[in-house]
Protein backbone atom coordinates (compact mmCIF):
# COMPACT_ATOMS: atom_id res chain seq x y z
CA UNK A 1 0.00 0.00 0.00
CA UNK A 2 1.41 3.36 -1.04
CA UNK A 3 1.47 6.12 1.59
CA UNK A 4 2.52 9.68 0.73
CA UNK A 5 4.87 11.74 2.88
CA UNK A 6 6.96 14.88 2.42
CA UNK A 7 10.70 14.45 2.09
CA UNK A 8 13.27 11.89 1.01
CA UNK A 9 13.98 8.36 2.20
CA UNK A 10 15.21 8.56 5.78
CA UNK A 11 13.02 11.54 6.68
CA UNK A 12 11.20 11.56 10.00
CA UNK A 13 7.90 11.61 8.08
CA UNK A 14 8.89 8.30 6.50
CA UNK A 15 9.53 6.92 9.99
CA UNK A 16 6.02 8.04 10.97
CA UNK A 17 4.61 6.14 7.98
CA UNK A 18 6.33 2.94 9.07
CA UNK A 19 5.37 3.43 12.72
CA UNK A 20 1.68 3.91 11.95
CA UNK A 21 1.17 1.41 9.12
CA UNK A 22 3.92 -1.14 9.81
CA UNK A 23 6.83 -2.01 7.55
CA UNK A 24 5.67 -5.20 5.84
CA UNK A 25 2.99 -3.98 3.44
CA UNK A 26 3.55 -0.23 3.24
CA UNK A 27 5.35 1.54 0.39
CA UNK A 28 6.27 5.11 1.43
CA UNK A 29 5.92 7.49 -1.51
CA UNK A 30 7.92 10.69 -1.14
CA UNK A 31 6.61 14.11 -2.17
CA UNK A 32 8.55 17.34 -2.62
CA UNK A 33 6.26 19.43 -0.42
CA UNK A 34 3.28 19.15 1.92
CA UNK A 35 0.78 20.29 -0.69
CA UNK A 36 1.78 17.36 -2.89
CA UNK A 37 0.92 14.98 -0.04
CA UNK A 38 -2.58 16.46 0.26
CA UNK A 39 -2.99 16.46 -3.52
CA UNK A 40 -1.92 12.81 -3.80
CA UNK A 41 -4.59 11.75 -1.31
CA UNK A 42 -7.22 14.02 -2.86
CA UNK A 43 -6.72 12.58 -6.36
CA UNK A 44 -6.58 8.97 -5.16
CA UNK A 45 -2.97 8.46 -6.21
CA UNK A 46 -2.49 7.08 -2.69
CA UNK A 47 -5.13 6.13 -0.10
CA UNK A 48 -3.37 7.90 2.76
CA UNK A 49 -0.76 10.52 3.53
CA UNK A 50 1.18 11.43 6.66
CA UNK A 51 2.07 15.03 7.57
CA UNK A 52 3.61 16.68 10.65
CA UNK A 53 1.34 19.07 12.51
CA UNK A 54 3.29 20.12 15.61
CA UNK A 55 6.63 19.72 17.32
CA UNK A 56 7.17 19.69 21.08
CA UNK A 57 9.93 22.33 20.78
CA UNK A 58 9.21 24.46 17.71
CA UNK A 59 5.43 24.31 17.81
CA UNK A 60 2.99 24.18 14.91
CA UNK A 61 3.64 23.36 11.28
CA UNK A 62 1.49 26.24 10.04
CA UNK A 63 1.44 25.29 6.37
CA UNK A 64 -0.35 22.04 7.14
CA UNK A 65 -2.96 23.79 9.29
CA UNK A 66 -3.70 25.99 6.28
CA UNK A 67 -3.85 23.01 3.91
CA UNK A 68 -6.51 21.34 6.06
CA UNK A 69 -8.66 24.38 5.41
CA UNK A 70 -8.06 24.20 1.66
CA UNK A 71 -8.48 20.45 1.10
CA UNK A 72 -11.60 18.45 1.88
CA UNK A 73 -9.75 15.57 3.53
CA UNK A 74 -10.12 13.85 6.89
CA UNK A 75 -7.76 12.84 9.66
CA UNK A 76 -8.02 9.13 10.49
CA UNK A 77 -5.08 8.79 12.88
CA UNK A 78 -2.23 10.40 14.76
CA UNK A 79 1.26 9.26 15.70
CA UNK A 80 4.17 10.71 17.66
CA UNK A 81 7.78 10.21 16.59
CA UNK A 82 10.78 10.96 18.81
CA UNK A 83 13.37 12.95 16.88
CA UNK A 84 17.03 12.11 17.46
CA UNK A 85 19.04 14.58 15.40
CA UNK A 86 22.63 13.85 14.45
CA UNK A 87 25.20 15.92 12.58
CA UNK A 88 26.11 14.34 9.24
CA UNK A 89 28.96 15.07 6.81
CA UNK A 90 30.73 13.61 3.82
CA UNK A 91 33.33 11.02 4.93
CA UNK A 92 36.29 13.34 4.24
CA UNK A 93 34.91 16.27 6.29
CA UNK A 94 36.23 16.88 9.80
CA UNK A 95 34.29 18.61 12.58
CA UNK A 96 36.59 21.65 12.58
CA UNK A 97 35.99 22.08 8.82
CA UNK A 98 32.26 22.75 9.21
CA UNK A 99 31.05 26.23 8.33
CA UNK A 100 27.48 25.70 7.08
CA UNK A 101 24.56 23.55 8.25
CA UNK A 102 21.82 22.30 5.91
CA UNK A 103 18.46 21.09 7.21
CA UNK A 104 14.73 21.68 7.36
CA UNK A 105 13.84 24.93 9.21
CA UNK A 106 12.16 22.99 12.03
CA UNK A 107 15.29 20.90 12.64
CA UNK A 108 17.49 23.99 12.52
CA UNK A 109 15.26 25.58 15.15
CA UNK A 110 15.39 22.49 17.33
CA UNK A 111 19.22 22.63 17.31
CA UNK A 112 19.51 26.42 17.49
CA UNK A 113 21.72 26.59 20.60
CA UNK A 114 24.15 24.01 19.25
CA UNK A 115 24.44 25.83 15.93
CA UNK A 116 24.91 29.24 17.55
CA UNK A 117 27.51 27.85 19.94
CA UNK A 118 29.69 26.90 16.98
CA UNK A 119 28.86 30.07 15.01
CA UNK A 120 27.83 28.13 11.91
CA UNK A 121 25.86 29.56 9.01
CA UNK A 122 22.54 27.89 8.18
CA UNK A 123 21.00 26.92 4.87
CA UNK A 124 17.31 25.94 5.24
CA UNK A 125 16.15 23.16 2.90
CA UNK A 126 12.94 21.28 2.17
CA UNK A 127 13.79 18.19 4.23
CA UNK A 128 16.20 16.73 6.80
CA UNK A 129 17.08 13.62 4.81
CA UNK A 130 17.04 15.71 1.63
CA UNK A 131 19.80 17.82 3.15
CA UNK A 132 21.99 14.75 3.50
CA UNK A 133 21.25 13.84 -0.10
CA UNK A 134 22.20 17.35 -1.26
CA UNK A 135 25.57 17.54 0.47
CA UNK A 136 26.42 14.04 -0.77
CA UNK A 137 25.40 14.58 -4.40
CA UNK A 138 27.14 17.95 -4.58
CA UNK A 139 30.08 16.77 -2.46
CA UNK A 140 29.86 20.00 -0.49
CA UNK A 141 32.95 20.73 1.60
CA UNK A 142 32.79 22.48 4.98
CA UNK A 143 29.13 21.48 5.21
CA UNK A 144 27.03 19.28 7.48
CA UNK A 145 23.39 18.25 7.60
CA UNK A 146 21.07 17.75 10.55
CA UNK A 147 18.97 14.64 10.08
CA UNK A 148 18.35 11.15 11.46
CA UNK A 149 20.83 8.33 11.90
CA UNK A 150 18.76 6.39 9.37
CA UNK A 151 19.38 9.10 6.76
CA UNK A 152 23.13 8.96 7.41
CA UNK A 153 23.16 5.19 6.93
CA UNK A 154 21.00 5.28 3.80
CA UNK A 155 23.35 7.70 2.06
CA UNK A 156 26.57 6.19 3.49
CA UNK A 157 27.54 9.41 5.21
CA UNK A 158 29.48 10.08 8.40
CA UNK A 159 27.84 10.88 11.73
CA UNK A 160 30.12 13.46 13.27
CA UNK A 161 28.08 14.39 16.37
CA UNK A 162 25.05 13.11 18.29
CA UNK A 163 22.64 14.55 20.86
CA UNK A 164 22.68 17.98 19.25
CA UNK A 165 19.07 19.05 19.89
CA UNK A 166 18.45 21.80 22.44
CA UNK A 167 15.99 19.55 24.25
CA UNK A 168 16.34 15.74 24.32
CA UNK A 169 12.57 15.42 24.71
CA UNK A 170 11.90 16.24 21.07
CA UNK A 171 8.75 14.79 19.52
CA UNK A 172 6.76 15.55 16.40
CA UNK A 173 3.08 14.74 16.14
CA UNK A 174 1.92 13.52 12.73
CA UNK A 175 -1.60 13.22 11.33
CA UNK A 176 -2.78 10.57 8.88
CA UNK A 177 -4.83 11.83 5.92
CA UNK A 178 -7.70 9.97 4.32
CA UNK A 179 -11.07 10.54 2.68
CA UNK A 180 -12.84 9.17 5.76
CA UNK A 181 -12.14 9.55 9.45
CA UNK A 182 -11.97 6.61 11.85
CA UNK A 183 -14.74 4.69 13.60
CA UNK A 184 -15.22 5.31 17.34
CA UNK A 185 -12.95 3.36 19.70
CA UNK A 186 -14.01 4.80 23.05
CA UNK A 187 -10.77 6.75 23.36
CA UNK A 188 -10.82 9.27 20.54
CA UNK A 189 -9.93 12.79 19.57
CA UNK A 190 -11.64 15.17 17.14
CA UNK A 191 -10.10 18.06 15.20
CA UNK A 192 -12.24 21.02 14.15
CA UNK A 193 -11.79 24.38 12.43
CA UNK A 194 -14.08 27.33 13.09
CA UNK A 195 -14.07 31.09 12.73
CA UNK A 196 -15.68 33.06 15.55
CA UNK A 197 -18.05 35.90 14.73
CA UNK A 198 -16.56 39.36 15.18
CA UNK A 199 -18.61 40.12 18.29
CA UNK A 200 -17.77 40.47 22.00
CA UNK A 201 -17.49 37.11 23.73
CA UNK A 202 -17.96 34.95 20.62
CA UNK A 203 -14.80 32.90 21.10
CA UNK A 204 -15.33 32.63 24.85
CA UNK A 205 -18.91 31.44 24.39
CA UNK A 206 -17.95 28.97 21.65
CA UNK A 207 -15.29 27.35 23.81
CA UNK A 208 -17.70 27.34 26.74
CA UNK A 209 -19.95 24.93 24.83
CA UNK A 210 -17.25 22.29 25.25
CA UNK A 211 -16.58 23.06 28.91
CA UNK A 212 -20.29 22.90 29.78
CA UNK A 213 -20.40 19.35 28.37
CA UNK A 214 -17.24 18.27 30.19
CA UNK A 215 -15.32 17.95 26.91
CA UNK A 216 -11.59 18.49 27.32
CA UNK A 217 -9.83 20.67 24.75
CA UNK A 218 -6.31 19.35 24.15
CA UNK A 219 -5.15 22.02 21.71
CA UNK A 220 -6.19 25.38 20.28
CA UNK A 221 -4.35 27.18 17.50
CA UNK A 222 -5.21 30.37 15.62
CA UNK A 223 -4.30 31.13 12.01
CA UNK A 224 -5.08 34.23 9.90
CA UNK A 225 -8.02 33.72 7.56
CA UNK A 226 -5.95 35.33 4.77
CA UNK A 227 -9.15 36.87 3.43
CA UNK A 228 -9.82 39.59 6.03
CA UNK A 229 -7.17 41.44 8.02
CA UNK A 230 -7.08 40.57 11.72
CA UNK A 231 -9.64 37.79 11.36
CA UNK A 232 -8.65 34.29 12.49
CA UNK A 233 -9.59 30.67 12.09
CA UNK A 234 -9.32 28.54 15.21
CA UNK A 235 -8.14 24.95 15.06
CA UNK A 236 -9.09 22.90 18.09
CA UNK A 237 -8.56 19.31 19.19
CA UNK A 238 -10.89 17.86 21.79
CA UNK A 239 -11.37 14.50 23.45
CA UNK A 240 -14.24 12.43 22.09
CA UNK A 241 -15.60 11.26 18.73
CA UNK A 242 -17.75 13.51 16.57
CA UNK A 243 -20.52 10.88 16.61
CA UNK A 244 -20.86 11.01 20.42
CA UNK A 245 -23.95 12.96 21.42
CA UNK A 246 -22.12 15.40 23.69
CA UNK A 247 -19.63 16.16 20.89
CA UNK A 248 -22.34 16.48 18.26
CA UNK A 249 -24.27 18.84 20.53
CA UNK A 250 -21.18 20.98 21.22
CA UNK A 251 -20.34 21.26 17.52
CA UNK A 252 -23.90 22.29 16.70
CA UNK A 253 -23.96 24.76 19.61
CA UNK A 254 -20.85 26.67 18.52
CA UNK A 255 -22.38 27.39 15.11
CA UNK A 256 -24.34 30.30 16.58
CA UNK A 257 -21.03 31.94 17.53
CA UNK A 258 -19.16 31.05 14.32
CA UNK A 259 -19.18 32.15 10.71
CA UNK A 260 -18.22 28.62 9.66
CA UNK A 261 -17.19 25.25 11.10
CA UNK A 262 -15.37 22.32 9.53
CA UNK A 263 -14.74 18.93 11.11
CA UNK A 264 -11.30 17.69 10.06
CA UNK A 265 -11.84 14.26 11.55
CA UNK A 266 -12.18 11.95 14.53
CA UNK A 267 -9.52 9.33 15.22
CA UNK A 268 -8.04 7.17 18.00
CA UNK A 269 -6.25 9.28 20.60
CA UNK A 270 -2.52 8.59 20.92
CA UNK A 271 -1.33 11.83 22.54
Question: What residue ranges belong to the model's regions?
Answer:
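Domain-level signature for soluble enzymes in the chorismate/prephenate branch of the shikimate pathway
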Residues: 1-271
Amino acid sequence: MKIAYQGEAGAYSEMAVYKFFGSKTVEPTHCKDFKDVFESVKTGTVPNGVVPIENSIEGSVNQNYDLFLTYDLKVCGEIAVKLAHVLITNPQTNFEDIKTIYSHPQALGQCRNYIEKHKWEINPTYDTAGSVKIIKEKQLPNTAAIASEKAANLYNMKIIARDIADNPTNYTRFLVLSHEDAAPTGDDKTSLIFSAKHAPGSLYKALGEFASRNINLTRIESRPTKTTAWQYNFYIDFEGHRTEKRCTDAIQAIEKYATFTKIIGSYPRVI
